[in-house]
Amino acid sequence: MAEANLDPVFQIQRVYLKDLSLEQPNSPEILLNQEQPGVEIQLGVDAKPVAEGLFEITVTATVHTKIEEKTVFMVEAKQAGIFEIRNIQSDQMGALLGIACPQIVYPYLRSNVADIIQRGGFPPVHMAEINFQAMYEQQQAEAMMATSEAPQILV
């Protein structure tokens, strides 16, 4: 009788661009302005199971540039990966989904965002490297604080 293989499995099935948009709502007038725009970048990570042992990790970015209160351009992007993760201890799953997987997907997102901005006629916006471990630990700490601050109901 063959034994079931219980070796840990962690591998990439696919990395893909899930969504990408570039908006220039105030063009062409805003392009004549010589001021340097302000840049705001927001990032997010989402993980969800898609099948037994398969997880989709999506890293999202929004890059919003403004001159005064007028938008120069806004990019919204979602880069995703499908990962096979099996036979991993449950206490290690959060770190894999929140740190290891986003670290693999993020460089693809950075490249796609820089490319679409340049194709839109703008100088590239280079998104910095992200410490996903620090981001994950901060989210975990915030979740712990939220549960500890929840009102206690005594029965």
From Swiss-Prot:
Question: Which Gene Ontology MF annotations are present?
Answer: unfolded protein binding
**GO cellular component terms attached to this protein's record:** cytoplasm
Which terms are listed as keywords in the entry?
Answer: Chaperone, Cytoplasm, Protein transport, Translocation, Transport
Family annotation (InterPro entries): SecB, SecB-like_sf
Q: Which GO terms describe its biological process?
A: protein folding; protein tetramerization; protein transport
- Indicate yes or no for the key word Chaperone: yes
**Domain of life from the UniProt record:** Bacteria
Query: Calcium: is it a keyword of this entry?
Result: no
Gene3D superfamilies reported in the protein's UniProt record: SecB-like (3.10.420.10)
Recorded hits in NCBIfam families, A to Z, give: PRK05751.1-5, secB
Function description? One of the proteins required for the normal export of preproteins out of the cell cytoplasm. It is a molecular chaperone that binds to a subset of precursor proteins, maintaining them in a translocation-competent state. It also specifically binds to its receptor SecA.
Q: What PANTHER family does this protein's entry cite? A: PROTEIN-EXPORT PROTEIN SECB (PTHR36918:SF1), PTHR36918
**Self-association and partners:** Homotetramer, a dimer of dimers. One homotetramer interacts with 1 SecA dimer.
- Protein's name in the database: Protein-export protein SecB 1
This protein's species is Polaromonas naphthalenivorans (strain CJ2)
Give the classification, highest ranks.
Bacteria, Pseudomonadati, Pseudomonadota, Betaproteobacteria, Burkholderiales
Q: Which gene encodes it?
A: secB1
